[in-house]
Amino acid sequence: MKYMTSGDIHRMFKQEDEGTIIRRNNVRRIALENGIKNTLTQNIILIDSKDFFDKVNPYNLQEHEYKIPKLRCIKDCAREWNKHRKTGDRFIHADEIRDFLKTDSTVFKYKFGNKWIVNYDQLLPHLKRINRRE
């Protein structure tokens, strides 16, 4: 029985998946709601790691059999492209992506409140084509 803090468990998940939804508060809530062994010491919740991973991963899966799509808003798509662009590639503005998505039906997009949620993996080949046009 090895006890870990919620921050340690969060860092483990973040190391495997940068965009994970597991946060320190989520870890605490999961532990408290699912009856996972935990101890409170000096305002720190220590969680039994083996019990936690048994509850979170009951079938002991080691690998993903699927690829989780990168869902981003349009502004984040532009930011991610511009952050990871290669030398010689041009900056792409969010308005260019917005104009492209108005006429495109191949990229998954979903209006959520005031923002469009876009599948970045499907958008990436189109961004490469937009990059070649000047």
State where each predicted segment sits.
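Polyanion-binding surface elements
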Residues: 1-26, 63-96
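A short, Lys/Arg-enriched interface patch at domain edges and termini
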Residues: 42, 50-70, 120-134
